[in-house]
Amino acid sequence: MDTSLPVNRRAFLTALAAAATAHSLRAQDRALVTKTPPKIKLGMDNFAVRAMGWKAAQLLDYAATLKVDVLLISDLEAYESLEDAPLREVKKKADDLGIEVYAGSWSICPTSTRFKKNWGTAEEHVRLGLRVAKTLGSPVFRVVLGAGEDRKTEGGIKARIADTVTVLKACRSQALDAGVKIAIENHAGDLHSWELAALIEEAGPDFVGANIDSGNAAWTLEDPMDVLETLGKYTICSSLRDDMIWETPDGASVQWTAAGEGLIDWKQFAARWSALCPATPIIIETISGFARNFPYKKPDFWQHYDQRPEAFAKFETLAKRGHAIPSFKAPEGVDRKKAEQDYQKGELERSIAYLRTKIGLGLKV
């Protein structure tokens, strides 16, 4: 009898089991690779360095030094010309630098306190922006309704939303023809996140989306993370920064900060961003150096806000965690304009560095 057969059989079965285990591990590795979230593009908004007064070409040169993927030029005044030929030159420069340009402008609500007639009627403004965006290769045209003051106007914010929706619907065919979506920002306390979501649904999410602003989230007394959960599925552009919030005798104060220097958990924020709107860039718009108090403990405060206790409770939790920080003040003996320029660049550059090195954002190294 061949007594070596059981030994060989055991060896064979052992080897087979090892191979199966190795194959299983490789399959798990492949699954992990498959499930690894895509890298999120990292960008800057030109408003972050507004004190520089740069035009598009200078903004692109600066953006290249930061190695960002996207430059949001959020106002039409930043171009030397809005004619197609000069805009194509801007696009060529951006392409050569490996930077995507996103186009934007300001209020398109004709009854907003922030609306200006620089670009004609609200509809003419939108159509101009769509043409600019298409020429630049921008997938979006970022706009705003207005500001918190609009909540106090006749008819309140609901009337301003209705007026904005009317403008958007009048421009639907042009947006679809251009292949450009209109991104509405929650801007300067004008819209709660749920109000912006309702505006988008009413106008038509096939051509309208959200430009989420984490700083302005705090100006409607919301947690930026909560705002992302509400608007994430609509988000096609962004203007982000951090928030420091702290309690005051009559409510809470909000001061915007560089990313990583406030209360936002950016690892968690980026993880949810990756799940909700992974193709949308995280664009930094630092606006820092001053605080605004919200006296929500006064009885007449809430008449202009849509109070939702569960949402407000999350804001209050942030206020309890935060602490007062000083406002920006130009150093003694330093030219104020130069100090402001240096301050703005510092806030933006620290934010980009933090999000790239600590959070892993951006396609470039």
Task: For the regions a language model picked out, list residue spans one by one.
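Catalytic domains of carbohydrate-active enzymes, especially glycoside hydrolases
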Residues: 58-76, 137
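Glycine-rich, proline-tolerant flexible connector loops at the mouths of alpha/beta enzymes
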Residues: 72-91, 148-152
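Active-site mouth loops of central-metabolism enzymes
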Residues: 43-55, 111-123
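Histidine-acidic metal/acid-base catalytic patches
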Residues: 2-6, 10-24, 28-41, 57-58, ...
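Active-site acidic/histidine proton-transfer and metal-coordination neighborhood
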Residues: 16-22, 34-37, 60, 93-100, ...
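Active-site beta-loop-alpha junctions enriched in small/polar residues
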Residues: 47-49, 76-78, 106-109, 146-148, ...
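Alpha-helix N-cap and loop-to-helix initiation/capping positions
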Residues: 81-89, 117-125, 155-163, 191, ...
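Hydrophobic faces of well-ordered beta-strands that scaffold small-molecule active sites
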Residues: 40-45, 71-73, 101-105, 141-143, ...
